[in-house]
Amino acid sequence: MKKLFATILAFLLFLAQVPVIAEPSAINCKVAEINTYGHAVLDITDEDFYKAGFALGDIVTVTAGSYTGDMPCFNGYYVDREATLVYINPFVGSITLGVNYGSFVNLSGVGKGDAVTIAMKEKGGVLDIQEVNNLVYSDERADFASDEVFANFRPVVEGKLYRSVSPVDNRIKRARTADNLIREAGVQTVMNMVNTDEEIVELMAADDYDSPYYRELYEAGKVIALEMSIDYTVKAFVEGLVEGFTFLSEGETPFLVHCLEGKDRTGFAIMTLEALMGWSEEQIVADYMKTYSNFYGIEPGTDRYDLIMEKNIEEMLRYMEALQADTSTSETDLKTAAEAFLRENGMAEEALKRLEAKLASE
């Protein structure tokens, strides 16, 4: 009995010396700015966030404005449409309260200077989702197989329609490469889905601007600046799409469609144009997913590939067709659906037919 008592006592003494890992204290911070997407950028950095004991894959409880709720912490928008998240930008280290394809400001009423509290809800609660989706790419040309892969540049229809990263905005260090490629392709008309005219002028005045061909096109009136939201479900996006397509219909081929990365906004626009050209669902999906191969090395047959395909391009197709979320897009005529989508949103019949004719195979 004495031996048993001594053993228990020793074990209890051991436990008393084991350090207890304290739950991170809540972070009290403020909204530094509201970005162009209506999301709240905080006045703390990722370094502050990590030092406080929080990490990617955690679930936290956020209080901001009229909003109190639980959010996952991700370095990408790995949540369903209209779901909230704490977005930890892997490139600039900012912390943002966001809504996927929505506005956190509209949800919470929060404004610049307002107080925000972040508290731990569940450590590592969504770490598996973070690890599957962790999409971070290099800005070094040497890490990519070719200039085309680096600039996410490719022909949709050789000699008629191309897509790429921005040749004017050098934030992701690819503008000059893209500019060289569009010059070699002989691009004549550009649909810029992300910038205003004022922003383009500012970008061309920047010290690191080195895209002479884009400047030439812009100064010749061959670039339309649309400043479109990333949310393709809002009216302004579709209005911008129709305006951009009408501009292309009046321009000379080859066309270029781009945003910043040539991924989301460009993805929806190109999807619609491919549908107009009679592409199958399989062809459209394969082209869209090529961007994820270029940037992140994500290939068919992987969990990441299937997840991104389901959450992104297949949802885009369903939206264009106004289908229920559980309806197969392969059951519909995509060309007819794309034409109806554009007509219903204000594209003139003459412009639509002119665009289709310019994209048609010779």
Where are these regions (language model features)?
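Residues marking helix boundaries in flexible regions
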Residues: 9, 22, 64, 165-166
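Active-site cradle of extracellular carbohydrate-active enzymes
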Residues: 256, 260
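Long, compositionally biased stretches
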Residues: 23-99, 105-119
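Sec-dependent signal peptide cleavage junction
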Residues: 15-24
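Ser/Thr-glycine-rich phosphate-binding loops at phosphate-binding pockets of nucleotides
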Residues: 261, 265-266
